[in-house]
Amino acid sequence: MAQRRPAGKKIPFQKDSFLQQFEKLAQSRKHHVLLESARGGRYSIAGLDPIATVKGKDGITTIKHGDEMLFKEGDPLRAFHSWFKTLETETNHEFPDFQGGAIGFLSYDYARYIENFKMLSLDDLETPDIYFLVFDDIAVYDHQEESLWLITHVNGSDQETADVKLSELEQMWLTELPAVTSREMKPETAGSFAAPFTEDGFSQAVEKIKQYIASGDVFQVNLSIRQSQSLSVHPYQIYKTLREVNPSPYMAYLETPDFQIICGSPELLVSKKGKLLETRPIAGTRSRGKTNEEDEALANELIHNEKERAEHVMLVDLERNDLGRVSRYGSVRVNEFMAIEKYSHVMHIVSNVQGELQDGYDAVDIIHAVFPGGTITGAPKVRTMEIIEELEPTRRGLYTGSIGWFGYNHDLQFNIVIRTIYATGGQAFMQSGAGVVIDSVPKHEYKESFKKAFAMQRALELSEEETKIR
């Protein structure tokens, strides 16, 4: 059988038209996904018609590919990847980085397949351990050139089939469609935020962590709080609002019949392009100032704060060590150190770490080396994960997992799931946390956790207000 290859064409397209057409096309599809960099990135990716869906939970992975249903046991990512490798292609260097492949997520709880620790917390949401949609046909918007790449896959030199498929994709994206029908939830389901982790419970957990730190178990632990609220608007409306309220580098909207994901993450877990590996840890947070002067003063205080600097350096070292597991010896380097990045409601300290992939390692090895990100667990990573399992009342599910893609061309990119809403059963769930160290004050860490959720809460509130006005 001839080897598969990507085929593509580029057409002029306006950014607003891309988002409007995606929303119109998505209305009639049960599964669809949009990956965007609403802050400085070059490409946005739309997937509308997956050739396969992949779900892994509790050691069983289900792959639905056309009329075929496969069931595999064991590590769900390895099970999926063993099947996915049969679809792989070589890179076409004229095309965008993502040229087709799998888009989806790894939940935080996927870490249980990498590190062996006890399952103590409640799995109340039953979020899949992994979930992916596999796309042969994709649309990639190039913000730099204001053009739309349409990409499909064919066998070998079959240009005739490629031309037909690309013509169909072009017609789909250029055809004038009716305006989007409002997809509202029942108004009576709207409600206020509820958090099962009370301030007293959180404070007790912080004190317990400080005991672990004092006894030498760990240096720092990220402790989080989950909130929930009944939904009164469709999740995609919330996503549209979030991208305006808090544009971020690693945004995502994923819709399935069972759940929807609204992600505004600022943080990269890992990317691979050719042999180049990158991770971009974030550690250190302050609120934005109300004036330029206050903003600069807060940024200056953050970057010179000894506690924040020490925590950041520790986590950069952790990420260097993780990346070093799969990198050529001597290739790991920090090419950007302790920069300030500002978002709508908060600012962060950010660094960038690079390495060169060692021969013999594949995509699963890369994920196993770095997942979950150390900035959202703590250090040392495995012991902090055991403590999180002991102290947080429910499983994290999607929170602090990763959303992203595995390309047919062996490349990959995954974020860290923060600033994210997981919608299911008419409820919106969001989670945020704070890094606890030896001198942490419980009430301050409690407030910081809620501060990080403000952009998500604001997006929900504005979406509801807009629906009422209509």
From Swiss-Prot:
Gene Ontology biological-process entries: folic acid biosynthetic process; L-tryptophan biosynthetic process; tetrahydrofolate biosynthetic process
Protein name per Swiss-Prot or TrEMBL: Aminodeoxychorismate synthase component 1
Protein family (similarity comment): Belongs to the anthranilate synthase component I family.
Cysteine disulfide partners in this protein: none
Effect caused by changing A283K: Absence of covalent intermediate
One Gene Ontology MF term: 4-amino-4-deoxychorismate synthase activity
Cofactors that this protein relies on: Mg(2+)
Annotated EC: 2.6.1.85
Role this protein plays: Part of a heterodimeric complex that catalyzes the two-step biosynthesis of 4-amino-4-deoxychorismate (ADC), a precursor of p-aminobenzoate (PABA) and tetrahydrofolate. In the first step, a glutamine amidotransferase (PabA) generates ammonia as a substrate that, along with chorismate, is used in the second step, catalyzed by aminodeoxychorismate synthase (PabB) to produce ADC.
Note: The catalytically active amino acid residue K274 of E.coli enzyme is missing and corresponds to A283 in B.subtilis. It is postulated that the enzymatic mechanism for the PABA biosynthesis in B.subtilis proceeds without covalent intermediate. First, ammonia is added at C2 of chorismate with concomitant loss of the C4 hydroxy group, yielding 2-amino-2-deoxyisochorismate (ADIC). The second step is the addition of a second molecule ammonia to C4 of ADIC with concomitant loss of the C2 amino group, yielding ADC. Both steps are catalyzed by ADCS.
Recorded metabolic or biological pathway in which this protein acts: Cofactor biosynthesis; tetrahydrofolate biosynthesis; 4-aminobenzoate from chorismate: step 1/2
Keywords noted in UniProt: Folate biosynthesis, Magnesium, Transferase
Subunit structure: Monomer. Heterodimer consisting of two non-identical subunits: a glutamine amidotransferase subunit (PabA) and a aminodeoxychorismate synthase subunit (PabB).
InterPro entries according to UniProt: ADC_synthase, Anth_synth_I-like, Anth_synth_I_N, Chorismate_C
UniProt source species: Bacillus subtilis (strain 168)
Catalytic activity: chorismate + L-glutamine = 4-amino-4-deoxychorismate + L-glutamate
